[in-house]
Amino acid sequence: MLAQLIPKQGGAPITLTRAITVVGRTSKLCDLVIDHTNVSKQHCILVKTDGLLYLRDLGSTNGTRVNGQRVVRGALLPGDQLSLSGISYRVHLGPDNPAAGKVSPIQPT
């Protein structure tokens, strides 16, 4: 499964390549580093499993929000807005191979 966080403020999409990704501002403790003072050292964890993306807040000071609501844990759906202390991303989920599932048109003979 392809899971990406698309920065709402612009910038390149962040592809989540690990099954479990620790998100925060400290590079020694986190797989995905967000360099912002309001993001906790270890802010949240993102888990890819069975074609879904799950979130668990790690007791962050300023909280984790999904679609404006503060959450402790839950599933993220395509198009959800994930906010870590005001830093916002749109969640994109899709197949590993974007061509998978596409059917080529039959060529006339």
Where are these regions (language model features)?
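Regulatory inter-domain linker segments that are low-complexity and enriched
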Residues: 1-4, 87-109
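Forkhead-associated
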Residues: 3-6, 15-86
